[in-house]
Amino acid sequence: MKILGIIPARYASTRFPGKPLIDILGKSMLQRVYDQAKKSELLTDVIIATDDERIAEHAKSFSAEVAITKAEHPSGTDRSYEAYLKTGKKYDYIINIQGDEPFIDPGQINLLANICDGNTELATLMIKCNSHDVLFDKGEVKITLNKNNEALYFSRMVIPFIKGVDEKEWHKHFNYYRHVGMYAYRADILEKVTQLKPSPLELAESLEQLRWLENGFKIKCAETLHDSHCIDTPEDVEKVLKLMGLKS
């Protein structure tokens, strides 16, 4: 399988402008993500997709291939599709790698790549939800699965409701999973999902992947044991360094 890894990187950010270029222990966040992605032996190529010349020039400084995309896209999926087309090459799958996880585990990328078997249309990662607080956090997206580990639904609410059990104990009575936001797309499916219009469920939950489910596409889910540590604000830098044991 030929698999392309794409790292979207935008300079504009409401909460953290210039985020991809911030310094983290001597390297930019973008370079750290890129270096981690390159450690995955299952990716054929890795490119950075950006709409900003400052990011493009920086990426070239550490010899990364860059695809310049237009500034406005409805979603990261659309940006990934444009970047894929700009390579001028054919790939079987495209994996969208979050550009704000400087210490992403290459094993997570491999885990996703391993289920890209030609039959899988779309794929993503999930991690067990083992606490009441995380389970009921509406910022955490939960996944409901069928017996083939394909997503039935993604929601900010808790699904299923467990009748007759105190909600503080629900996580002890059912295997709940939350979403870890990295996606793999079969190339032909990526083209199709970018043609879809926003759907009612997507608009209600503000979750793009519900558009795919509503239109009959299947999303395979693989369980990871490694949590993701995103940087969304300047304060997150210190938090992530402490979580990774890189700062006391």
Give the label of every model feature segment.
Residues 5, 46-48, 94, 123, ...:
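Hydrophobic/aromatic residues located in beta-strands of well-ordered beta-sheets
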Residues 104-196:
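Conserved core of the sugar-phosphate nucleotidyltransferase
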Residues 50-51, 104, 185, 232:
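A conserved hydrophobic position in a structured secondary element of the catalytic/binding core
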Residues 47, 53-111:
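Short phosphate-binding loop-to-helix
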Residues 43, 89-91, 118-121, 217:
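Short, high-confidence coil segments that cap the C-terminus of an alpha-helix
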Residues 2-49:
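N-terminal glycine-rich phosphate-binding loop and ensuing alpha1 helix
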Residues 89, 170-248:
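Conserved alpha/beta core of the MobA/IspD/sugar-nucleotide pyrophosphorylase nucleotidyltransferase superfamily
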Residues 4, 47, 101, 142, ...:
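A residue-level structural signature of the nucleotidyltransferase/glycosyltransferase Rossmann-like core
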